[in-house]
Curated annotation (Swiss-Prot):
GO terms for biological process: DNA-templated transcription. This is DNA-directed RNA polymerase subunit beta. Belongs to the RNA polymerase beta chain family. Keywords: DNA-directed RNA polymerase, Nucleotidyltransferase, Transcription, Transferase.
Length: 1184
């Protein structure tokens, strides 16, 4: 195998990698943000129309007026995407709806087009722009509507069952057994009733009718005994009393209540998915499987016998009678009397012998194939679900696993928007009805009826404050892509963190190929937030499907026909793994093949295989698929690796990894961070900000040139996370490009591939203990050569408002500020672009009028003579906060006069962008792709770093002890392969679960002329002596993470204090102090450091008088005074007194001290000495 393992694969225009993949890719990866774009497109095409259809027509209470929705269209957006961002606006288009108002008395018809608010549009990248910020709507995983059965044990260990019919919206119906074998029903979470009461209410009034319907059995007899009603009317009254306790029940009220609760499409909605699930569950086909018939089945039309009494219905027999089942075998038309529904009920019922009692006949009742468009529940559904429940008690039927992905579905953007829009429309409907009855019928127009406020408000609320509408994670392109593919079980109608148990969070076998088992956050959300697997798609019902290659049942060959299966469908098939060996014709070469069936992994004869995986990476998500040698890492560490890649800061000079997985190109292309070609063509002109492409198309075999596409590149824009979003051209003039090709690299990209970090020379060795506990030692070369330098852009804004005392003003003329501080401000008081600023420098000069104080006699005299009072203003300028210094990149000014839309009361708004270039630094966090993270503890001069025999110093030293216990061996393989790749001048691709194996790595190492063990002798840079043992040195891909020490460093001498306790606030954001907590106090007590302790608890914290005096003493150079009484002690006393306790303070001589005596008289002007937080900022108080 020496030398030539692997083959070359091209990724985009500029990169070729040697790939070690053995399995050929049958299927291209789908477009990775399709889950967002396709769902929104559905909403625009179908979802909106469905909504208007549901609500139309709106009729008034008398039925004279009727308002219909005929059509709608979306206009052109007011601003482009870029403009919306700059102006803090929404990227939205006006929604216009065509309405028709019909006056039924006069037959008059009025048509009118009505504006219904601006509707947010999705950008091509799958994001929304709301108030100028990019947001993502995360898809939600919820329980699918349908009917579920589950087994449960009561406290005596007796097995019982429970069942629930869950609608999309409407009342729940729950069945359960109790200890006495009585079957109960609960309607909409009320008290339970015997289930026979519900059957009687449906019109099966007598005991005999119920027994004929369900079939005679002990459970039913027990339930009938418990049931104290004996006809339909009594049953209706009984149900009414449960649902509306305290109201006088009448039969008519009860009837209409039940009808509106369950059979009214406006109040009860299963959605198409619920109808599909219910029909599937209650269908006789699945319920008769492997059962023994207790009656002979006869075709109702021809009279021929289809199956005889005593036949066992195995898969073959069942498949034969399915067409007959669908044509009406066993159909019974029931005619209920006095019940809720007047119409007859059609059910399908077949008798079989109970599996747990051969003598006993039981009825299996199905709902007789209700049409897909019936969105509410029907009496036959209720009867069939009750029948299923009784069948379960006799061992027929299956219970459902709620965590199975066949029972959980996705609500993507389109559906979430539709639900929100529906809320708005139904609120509007109420208003329309009221207006219809109030206004004059002759002159009324649709425009006067419609109030669009509720609709606009509900959409705004959804995008602005829903839990699923999130500020996009834009740290780097991978973070962006993952955020759009995220699946959350939280949010409205979903789970809550506290309630979610272990089962919901756990990995389930049905996740295979649908949800990534690895990528999920660590912490309270683990398992509740997941990521879509790389090949997964979402079907029209919202179930996740994964692709498989079909195996031809005749020839047993694997074909290239791809089927997308939901978790439910997959349960019926045996699926072989992607790495099963095939010959050229696609036949399995081995007799026994490793395969999956439901939750089992089995070795199966090759004839039993139905499907085969398309690719080894179909199990994992995009971020996980970017980890090379994933198969050699422990899953916990892989999880950290996948999550940390999303936190990589875009570097100034990014570099694609030597050891990649081949996913780098696809993920960069689909993330939306790159500039991609919209059409084929030839590049005519390239500059930093623009690329022009002349379109070229083939017409009748001839090339025809068309118009020019101009692509604008974004330069040095601030991303949502404050990293620098910068695009660079990736093509040259004269290049031919094809549609979808990358024209410009975005942030963290190199030659059209994702490039989150840099390839650096790493040695696994300790060095004077500086890499204890995962710390990292780094060479100064990485600082000097800007290897890990990143650019950060921060935004600060200042607004001039109207106040009660007059307008604020932006000006250069600021009280008590020297000319030196104003040197970089222009005549308007705004900083110039390019100025270098440090902490506390002025950015925008602004003054606010002060309250007018009582004038003294002298001032009044002066005022009388000169008529001019000294201008009373205070300085409220915008200054650079701590740690925010840098260079002013850009200044944006918005004013009312220039026609910019500003919030009410704001006259002028100034935004200042400050850019920082951050070199790597001690205390910064770095990581590899295998969950191997650490903090830089020391940056050594190049000459002190250990060097290789050829004199090359290493770049980074990692602790070898970080590897064995964490079991992420992938990093060691990456190290050796990376070294070989660098020596050979190649890039390699080692896809997950199908990458380079050990032999490949060693043969590449040998090809590169490295030592057999891939280790090196290293020499100490300080003494020049060789280290005792050979050391693993190689090239590893290391990334710098967003947790940088500059953002965390914080110090305070004096600052804001909390209003009530007078203690310093906490946290960097509030410029707070460090909490000296209970345990720290114990430490000082243990040392007997009484004075230090007293000082910390009083003058450094909340002894208001003492801290001012101490400050004064320090300034004047005097000795520090005695500490006084802490403010929190006074608060404690007041709290005790407010509880009605008489608390007195006594001095040493047991004399009472008044609270007032504790304050010093000469202490008056404390508010000027210290900035005490006033109540409006009291929100900043963080209670520990």
């Amino acid at each position: 195998m020496s030398g030539h393992s692997g083959h070359d694969v091209k990724y985009g225009r500029h990169r070729t990698r040697r790939s070690f993949a053995r399995i050929s890719e049958v299927l291209e990866l789908p477009n990775l943000i399709e889950i967002q774009t396709a769902s929104y497109q559905w909403f625009l095409d179908e979802g909106l129309r469905e909504m208007f259809r549901d609500i139309s027509p709106i009729e008034d209470f008398a039925g004279n007026l009727s308002l219909e929705f005929i059509d709608y269209d979306l206009g052109e957006p007011k601003y482009s995407v870029e403009e919306s961002k700059n102006r803090d606006a929404n990227y939205a288009a006006p929604l216009r709806v065509k309405l028709r108002l019909i006056n039924k008395e006069t037959g008059e018809v009025k048509d009118q087009e009505v504006f219904m608010g601006d509707f947010p549009l999705m950008t091509e990248m799958g994001t929304f722009i709301i108030n100028g910020a990019e947001r993502v709507i995360v898809s939600q995983l919820v329980r699918s509507p349908g009917v579920y059965f589950n087994g449960k044990l009561d406290k005596n260990g007796k097995k019982g069952f429970g069942s629930t019919v869950i609608p999309n919206r409407g009342a729940w119906l729950e069945y359960e057994t109790d200890a006495k074998d009585v079957v109960h029903v609960r309607i909409d979470r009320t008290r339970k009733l015997p289930v026979t009461v519900l059957l009687r209410a449906l019109g099966f009034g007598s005991d005999q009718e119920i027994i004929d319907l369900i079939g005679d059995n002990d459970y039913l007899r027990n339930t009938l005994e418990k049931d104290n009603t004996d006809n339909a009317e009594k049953a209706l009254l009984e149900i009414y009393e449960r649902l509306r306790p305290g109201e006088p029940p009448t039969v008519d009220n009860a009837r209409s209540l039940l009808v509106s609760r369950f059979f009214d499409p406006k109040r009860y909605d299963l959605a198409s998915v619920g109808r599909y699930k219910i029909n599937k569950k209650l269908h006789l086909k699945n319920r008769l499987f492997n059962q023994t018939l207790a009656e002979t089945l006869v075709d109702p039309e021809t009279g021929e016998i289809i199956a005889s009494k005593g036949d066992i219905l195995d898969r073959r027999n069942l498949d034969q009678i399915i067409p007959n089942l669908e044509n009406g075998v066993g159909f019974r038309t029931l005619r209920p009397t006095d019940g809720v529904m007047e119409d007859s009920v059609l059910v399908q019922s077949i008798k079989i012998y109970a599996p747990n009692d051969e003598e006993k006949e039981i009825n299996i009742i199905g709902n007789a194939y209700i049409e897909e468009n019936v969105k509410h529940i029907t009496p036959s559904d209720i009867i069939s679900s009750i029948s299923y429940f009784f069948n379960l008690l006799h061992g027929v039927g299956d219970t459902d696993d709620i965590d199975h992905l066949g029972n959980r579905r996705l609500r993507s953007v389109g559906e979430l928007l539709q639900n929100q829009f529906r809320i708005g429309l139904s609120r509007m409907e109420r208003v329309v009805r009221e207006r219809m009855s109030i206004q004059d019928m002759t002159t009324i127009t649709p425009q006067q009826l419609i109030n669009i406020r509720p609709v606009v408000a509900s959409i705004k609320e959804f995008f602005g404050s829903s839990q699923l509408s999130q500020f996009m994670d834009q740290t780097n392109p991978l973070g962006e892509l993952t955020h759009k593919r995220r699946l959350s079980a939280l949010g409205p109608g979903g789970l809550t963190r506290e309630r979610a148990g272990y089962e919901v969070r756990d990995v389930h076998y049905s996740h295979y190929g649908r949800m990534c088992p690895i990528e999920t956050p660590e912490g309270p959300n683990i398992g509740l937030i997941n990521s879509l697997s790389s090949f997964a798609k979402v079907n029209k019902f919202g179930f996740i499907e994964t692709p498989y290659r079909r195996v031809d049942p005749e020839t047993n060959r694997v074909t290239d026909k791809i089927d997308y299966l939901t978790a439910d469908e997959e349960d019926n098939y045996v699926v072989a793994q992607a790495n099963s060996k095939l010959d050229e014709q696609g036949t399995f070469t081995e007799e026994e093949v490793m395969a999956r069936f439901r939750s089992e992994n089995l070795a199966v004869e090759k004839e039993r295989i139905d499907y085969m995986d398309v690719s080894p990476k179909q199990v994992v998500s995009v971020a996980t698929a970017c980890i090379p040698f994933l198969e050699n890492d422990d899953s916990n560490r892989a999880l950290m690796g996948a999550n940390m890649q999303r936190q990589a800061v875009p570097l100034m000079h990014p570099e694609a990894p030597f050891v990649g997985t081949g996913m780098e190109h696809v993920s960069a292309k689909d993330s939306g961070a790159a500039v991609t070609a919209k059409h084929d063509g030839i590049v005519e002109h390239v500059e930093a900000r623009e690329i022009w492409v002349r379109r070229v198309s083939l017409v009748d075999g001839k090339e025809v040139t068309g118009g020019i596409d101009k692509y604008t590149l974004r330069k040095f824009v601030r991303s949502n996370q404050g990293t620098c979003y910068n695009q660079r051209p990736n093509v040259a003039e004269g290049d031919r490009v094809v549609k979808g090709e990358i024209l410009g690299n975005g942030p963290s990209m190199d030659s059209g591939e994702l490039a989150l970090g840099r390839n650096v020379l790493v040695a696994f060795m300790t060095w004077d203990g500086y890499n204890y506990e995962d710390a990292i030692i780094m060479s100064e070369r990485l600082v000097k050569d800007d290897v890990y330098t990143s650019i950060h852009i921060e935004e600060f804004e200042s607004e001039a408002r109207d106040t009660k005392l007059g307008p604020e003003e932006m000006t250069r003329d600021i009280p008590n500020v020297g000319e030196d501080a104003l040197r970089d401000l222009d005549e308007r008081g705004i900083i110039r672009v390019g100025a270098e600023v440090k902490d506390n420098d002025l950015l925008v000069g602004k003054v606010t009028p002060k309250g007018v104080t009582e004038l003294t006699a002298e001032e009044r005299l002066l005022h009388a003579i000169f008529g001019e009072k000294a201008r009373e203003v205070r300085d409220t300028s915008l200054r650079v906060p701590h740690g925010g210094g840098g260079i002013v990149l850009d200044v944006k000014i918005f004013t009312r006069e220039a026609g910019d839309e500003l919030p009410p009361g704001v006259n002028q708004l100034v935004r200042v962008y400050i850019v920082q270039k951050r070199k790597i630094h001690e205390g910064d966090k770095m990581a590899g792709r295998h969950g191997n993270k650490g903090v830089i503890s020391r940056i050594l001069p190049e000459e002190d770093m250990p060097f290789m025999p050829d004199g090359t110093p290493v770049d980074i030293m990692l602790n070898p002890l970080g590897v064995p216990s964490r079991m992420n061996i992938g990093q060691v393989l990456e190290l050796h392969l990376g070294m070989a790749a660098r020596a050979l001048g190649i890039h390699v691709a080692t896809p997950v679960f199908d990458g380079a194996n050990e032999e490949d790595v060693w043969s590449t190492v040998e090809e590169a002329g490295m030592a057999r063990d891939a280790k090196t002798v290293l020499y100490d840079g300080r003494s020049g002596e060789a280290f005792d043992n050979r050391i693993s040195v190689g090239v590893m891909y290391m990334i710098k993470l967003a947790h940088m020490v500059d953002d965390k460093l914080h110090a305070r001498s004096t600052g804001p204090y909390s209003l009530v306790t007078q203690q310093p606030l906490g946290g960097k954001a509030q410029f707070g102090g460090q909490r000296f907590g209970e345990m720290e106090v114990w430490a000082l007590e243990a040392y007997g450091a009484a004075y230090t302790l007293q000082e910390i608890l009083t003058i450094k914290s909340d002894d208001v008088v003492g801290r001012v005096k101490t400050y004064e003493a320090i300034v004047k150079g005097e000795s520090v005074p005695e500490p006084g009484v802490p403010e929190s002690f006074k608060v404690l006393i007041k709290e005790l007194q407010s509880l009605g306790m008489d608390v007195k303070m006594l001095s040493a001589d047991e004399e009472e001290i008044e609270m007032r005596d504790m304050d010093d008289d000469d202490f008056t002007n404390q508010n000027d000495a210290f900035n005490i937080v006033q109540p409006e900022n009291a929100a900043a108080e963080k209670t520990e």
